């Protein structure tokens, strides 16, 4: 049995809607209802911990809508459902968006009951777009709104995205990088997302790399030789002992340059202060400290 494809392309998106949007569209068409209507996208209520949301995805959605259309294959599949008239499907095959879309610029803070995207079109067309537009905008707005809180909590310190493995599917992982860029993150570990959306790539090393070597010193040395000014992960066994090993490595091989050490577990605040003390005392105040491990705005605020 042939497995269905998991990939979704732009040409598939005309069918990315709820069934009732299409059945209402057919009813509007059959009744000759062509009056213009305005559909507004806004937050009626914000969560108790949020003062604003960061609008994102609406300009992408607006551009996409202008390219939407139904292919012959899609019309055939709709006909197979038995819910649509042949003359309606013939009309749908010629359909393209004829309305207007208004949006605030992406990256604009928005508040309760403040529209940040409006579709003004014949009511049938505006109705058809509702589910797709809300899906496109909701994802990126939610991600950007969380990300900007993290950026604000970090202040002058750059924030990187290492969240690919926890994102809810491939589409969210790639489009999430676009939202992170809008929110002001400095880089991402997501290669596809970063290259597609023009965001600098950033990465360090994994605990598995450390464990693949005989000891931490061997892992640090090999990685630093290949990648000057790299970031070394120091918490696989003992965080502060890992920092001492990095210091010893830089002293033993003066040509090796280490840009930062990364802390990924434990009491990050206490360990960061300890690492800073060790590095400064050894004459390596230029080596930065990177903290990771599920950090959100609350944890970052406590750290800085």
Residue ranges and their predicted role:
Residues 292:
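Short acidic/histidine-rich active-site segments
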Residues 2-36, 45-47, 83, 89-98, ...:
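Buried, small/hydrophobic-residue-enriched core segments of structured protein domains
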